[in-house]
């Protein structure tokens, strides 16, 4: 079977390394490549994918929303998130999924077993935040809180959550068991500070969905304060495993995928 990841730029993507490691571990001769498709060429997506004879593909920045009009069907999670990161091509039909939310939550559950009883704050209200929020809301016993700079961003949400400003979030930080940053602040080349951690409780798990850099400024600050931290590496690995399951109906080798990504990040 043939797979790929599409984006622009795409040369930095670790998806090929991760998926190939999984294929090798499972003894599969499947292939996975990175395809750079600029925005101005995206209208040719059907033609490009058809020529490659792909069975499925991942989509990353900046095409996660742009792909939707080209799909024959979009699953509920992707509709809720307003973004697609996985496409299955079956019987000529393109089916869109979003595995980011379930990928993050599966990873988080592995480091925070009592997740159901946690009081959680999500920073940011974009597509990534939405996907994670919908997944968490399925089983959390306490109402989820989401903070954003502008309240207008919540107009497209139809989830029963506490909506607060980032300024209010700073004041109430001590109340939360887990704080999750879903904004681009801290991504390589972006040193913007999203929130002041002055009131962060020492017992709070500070998380970020970014994994490059391995420790974002907000994670470094929380770690200096003595907090446990959790980056986005597991989310990346688990969302990839979920994509593989959608494409092949097989379980991925999580350990081989994570090891391959870690080796790449360490420059091995």
Swiss-Prot record:
<dbReference type="InterPro" id="IPR046346">
    <property type="entry name" value="Aminoacid_DH-like_N_sf"/>
</dbReference>
<comment type="pathway">
    <text>Metabolic intermediate biosynthesis; chorismate biosynthesis; chorismate from D-erythrose 4-phosphate and phosphoenolpyruvate: step 4/7.</text>
</comment>
<dbReference type="GO" id="GO:0009073">
    <property type="term" value="P:aromatic amino acid family biosynthetic process"/>
</dbReference>
<dbReference type="Pfam" id="PF18317">
    <property type="entry name" value="SDH_C"/>
</dbReference>
<feature type="active site" description="Proton acceptor">
    <location>
        <position position="64"/>
    </location>
</feature>
<feature type="binding site">
    <location>
        <position position="100"/>
    </location>
    <ligand>
        <name>shikimate</name>
    </ligand>
</feature>
<dbReference type="InterPro" id="IPR036291">
    <property type="entry name" value="NAD(P)-bd_dom_sf"/>
</dbReference>
<keyword id="KW-0521">NADP</keyword>
<feature type="binding site">
    <location>
        <position position="60"/>
    </location>
    <ligand>
        <name>shikimate</name>
    </ligand>
</feature>
<protein>
    <recommendedName>
        <fullName>Shikimate dehydrogenase (NADP(+))</fullName>
        <ecNumber>1.1.1.25</ecNumber>
    </recommendedName>
</protein>
<dbReference type="GO" id="GO:0050661">
    <property type="term" value="F:NADP binding"/>
</dbReference>
<dbReference type="InterPro" id="IPR011342">
    <property type="entry name" value="Shikimate_DH"/>
</dbReference>
<dbReference type="Pfam" id="PF01488">
    <property type="entry name" value="Shikimate_DH"/>
</dbReference>
<comment type="subunit">
    <text>Homodimer.</text>
</comment>
<comment type="function">
    <text>Involved in the biosynthesis of the chorismate, which leads to the biosynthesis of aromatic amino acids. Catalyzes the reversible NADPH linked reduction of 3-dehydroshikimate (DHSA) to yield shikimate (SA).</text>
</comment>
<feature type="binding site">
    <location>
        <position position="232"/>
    </location>
    <ligand>
        <name>NADP(+)</name>
    </ligand>
</feature>
<comment type="similarity">
    <text>Belongs to the shikimate dehydrogenase family.</text>
</comment>
<feature type="binding site">
    <location>
        <begin position="13"/>
        <end position="15"/>
    </location>
    <ligand>
        <name>shikimate</name>
    </ligand>
</feature>
<feature type="binding site">
    <location>
        <begin position="148"/>
        <end position="153"/>
    </location>
    <ligand>
        <name>NADP(+)</name>
    </ligand>
</feature>
<dbReference type="InterPro" id="IPR022893">
    <property type="entry name" value="Shikimate_DH_fam"/>
</dbReference>
<feature type="binding site">
    <location>
        <position position="211"/>
    </location>
    <ligand>
        <name>shikimate</name>
    </ligand>
</feature>
<dbReference type="InterPro" id="IPR006151">
    <property type="entry name" value="Shikm_DH/Glu-tRNA_Rdtase"/>
</dbReference>
<feature type="binding site">
    <location>
        <begin position="124"/>
        <end position="128"/>
    </location>
    <ligand>
        <name>NADP(+)</name>
    </ligand>
</feature>
<feature type="binding site">
    <location>
        <position position="85"/>
    </location>
    <ligand>
        <name>shikimate</name>
    </ligand>
</feature>
<keyword id="KW-0057">Aromatic amino acid biosynthesis</keyword>
<dbReference type="GO" id="GO:0009423">
    <property type="term" value="P:chorismate biosynthetic process"/>
</dbReference>
<keyword id="KW-0028">Amino-acid biosynthesis</keyword>
<feature type="binding site">
    <location>
        <position position="76"/>
    </location>
    <ligand>
        <name>NADP(+)</name>
    </ligand>
</feature>
<dbReference type="InterPro" id="IPR041121">
    <property type="entry name" value="SDH_C"/>
</dbReference>
<dbReference type="GO" id="GO:0019632">
    <property type="term" value="P:shikimate metabolic process"/>
</dbReference>
<keyword id="KW-0560">Oxidoreductase</keyword>
<dbReference type="Pfam" id="PF08501">
    <property type="entry name" value="Shikimate_dh_N"/>
</dbReference>
<dbReference type="GO" id="GO:0005829">
    <property type="term" value="C:cytosol"/>
</dbReference>
<dbReference type="GO" id="GO:0004764">
    <property type="term" value="F:shikimate 3-dehydrogenase (NADP+) activity"/>
</dbReference>
<dbReference type="GO" id="GO:0008652">
    <property type="term" value="P:amino acid biosynthetic process"/>
</dbReference>
<feature type="binding site">
    <location>
        <position position="209"/>
    </location>
    <ligand>
        <name>NADP(+)</name>
    </ligand>
</feature>
<dbReference type="InterPro" id="IPR013708">
    <property type="entry name" value="Shikimate_DH-bd_N"/>
</dbReference>
